[in-house]
Amino acid sequence: MEELGRVRLSDPDALLPAGFWAAVTVWLERPQVANKRLCGARMEARGRTLRSHAQAECGPRQGQGHGLEREPGQASPKGEPESGPRASREGTAPAADLNSLWDRVSQSLVHANPEMLAFLCGPSLGPQPEAAQELDLILRTVIPKASPHSPLTEPKKELVVQDVSSGSVTFLPLEEDNEGNLEVKTSNVYQLHLHHNEGEWFISVLIFCPERWHSDGVVYPKPAWLGEELLSKLARWAVENRKSEFKSTLSLVSILRYSRMYQELKEKYRDMVKVWPEVTDPEKFVYEDVAIATYLLILWEEERAEKGVTTKQSFVDLGCGNGLLVHILSNEGHPGRGIDIRRRKIWDMYGPQTQLEEGSITPSDETLFPGVDWLIGNHSDELTPWIPVIAARSSYTCRFFVLPCCFFDFVGRYQRQQSRKTQYREYLDFVLEVGLSCGFHVQEDCLRIPSTKRVCLIGKSRTYPPSAEVWMDEQRTRYLHSRQGHPQSRPGGAHAPSAPQTAAHDAGLQDSCRTVNAGSECVLEGLAAERGAGAPAPGLWVPGFCPREKAERVRNCAALPRDFVDQVVLQVANLLLDRKKFNTGNSEARSLKPWNGGGSLSLAEVAAELNSETLQRLKRECGGLQTLLKNSHQVFEVLNGRVHIRDWRQELQRGKPPEAKQNLSAAVFKTRICWFFAHHPDGCVLPAAQCPFAHGPEELRLSQTLKKQRQAP
């Protein structure tokens, strides 16, 4: 036995020992969080036996009530986390199999490997109640990421033994013998151990047989990784005083099936990255849509199996954007189409089999899809809360999948009212509330995509029978009307009175008032209708809804007026220069006079110095203040959330071209006035010959773009 590492824990919030077991649960059920070469783990079965039985006889006694059984809902011992939802959903091994496996393993330890038995059980931490004298047994399958670089790596089974009384959890890798029976692979047994000594807590990682450890680099990492990387993550998780607001990733689908299909689709559609004609990041968007398509294909595959049908589901993607998701789903045999208000260049590359339509969707009786199985809203913006409503009214069998991103209400922007929740969590609860009010059983899951907003909501079934459709639609209408009664921002700050909400809601959701952005033209139309300017047009469900503009508005601060940008840049620069930081540089070619490089401020500190009107104007742009400062890269350097004055002497000393100089080719050299020459109290830190910007109008050159424009007939 060898201890690979030990770390002392600081526990000011008194989270231990429960925090240790919470950390173990993460490694047990979601090992991919620590080991990026894994796709996840599947909990096959759970059981429990008395610790004393394991020590004395290494097996459960018959007729004593402490044998092994599948128990996904049973309460865990105090200090130990509950089993997750995926454990009960994915567990496939019957109780008898786990019982038989433990009996065989424990008997072999008694007769052939008593040292491992001592390693497994260890000493008790002291007198414990009977519940804490039990061993929890878990059979899990560790699933590696499918990859062309490691095609031979297969899922591995492990028997995990959790001993709360000794503060240990032991991982016993399993392999099949010649007869197909599972037995312990003694070379790769390791243990996580929680110690309490003289008022201090420690976590350690131990290996039973270090000289025989075999690392495959995926499921079985090197011992150094266990003693350093894994141990440090466990130590951090154990004392984190926070609870996730969201479900586990991929909790509603088979992780093994997902891993294999994702790799297949990734290989199949990877060439899209090379020919991507849009200005967006090709790798992010291609692989994100591949991941979403993988999830939907498995979800629909399992749905067909549940219903005993073979016909592939049809779909409509509302607000389909680049259309790649529609293209993949169609190529994989699902009939469907995508609709978006603006055509994309890449649409022409898909071919006629991918049906994409340019058009707007206004929620009304004219925009129903009665023959469609699924409606999809993938970052569908203003249509997101409407998709459950459209699905519910299209047909009783229509289902929906939404992946919310931007926060929209039925009319205009959604604005939060609950400070106890994050804005994202509150918006998800709102969309969940819409689904419930429309009569859906709504499920929530987290996708594995490169995005901070990766929670999807799924409505697969209804809460009412088909015979109650007329009554249920009346409830939907009341709910929509009640949403219009929520306070809306009027000019001058007055609010419309709030009407009571009459639709039924899930008991776990908080009633809240939500306001609409007063600056939106859509809201003004809604207010006009509310004041008697007109009722909804025939067939429209609410007044005031406005689809997004067909022409995409540039929102990266590039379209802001030049004088506004110059004013903000000068104000922020003066704030930094006031925090004087003089330096002289060490090059003989430059002046040795002191030059004020200024101090640094966090983005929050900079924002606190700007007036509310400026902040509101920046807030309407993507990235806001940070984007404006990064765009002004001649003047500023933004690193780790802090703003600095850029020192061009340091830029010239760097080995690779700096961020601010990467685009300063010969074509743009001296085509703009040097900001430091014009505004810095000490002037530019570089001589005119070395500065890529013009020191005065006499140095200005005409850019190549303007030259071509002037030469054109």
UniProtKB/Swiss-Prot annotation:
GO molecular function terms attached to this record: tRNA(Ser) (uridine(44)-2'-O-)-methyltransferase activity; zinc ion binding
Composition-biased stretches (Basic and acidic residues): 79-89
Residues annotated as signal peptide: none
EC number(s) recorded for this UniProt protein: 2.1.1.211
Subcellular location: Cytoplasm
Highest taxon, organism lineage: Eukaryota
InterPro entries: SAM-dependent_MTases_sf, tRNA_uracil_MeTrfase, Znf_CCCH
Positions of region (Disordered): 49-92, 480-508
PROSITE patterns: ZF_C3H1 (PS50103)
Residues the record lists as Phosphoserine modifications: 76, 489
Catalytic activity: uridine(44) in tRNA(Ser) + S-adenosyl-L-methionine = 2'-O-methyluridine(44) in tRNA(Ser) + S-adenosyl-L-homocysteine + H(+)
One Pfam entry name: AdoMet_MTase
GO biological-process terms attached to the record: methylation; tRNA processing
Zinc finger C3H1-type: from-to: 669-698
Protein family per UniProt: Belongs to the TRM44 family.
Described purpose of this protein according to its UniProt entry: Probable adenosyl-L-methionine (AdoMet)-dependent tRNA (uracil-O(2)-)-methyltransferase.
The protein, known as: Probable tRNA (uracil-O(2)-)-methyltransferase
Organism this protein belongs to: Mus musculus
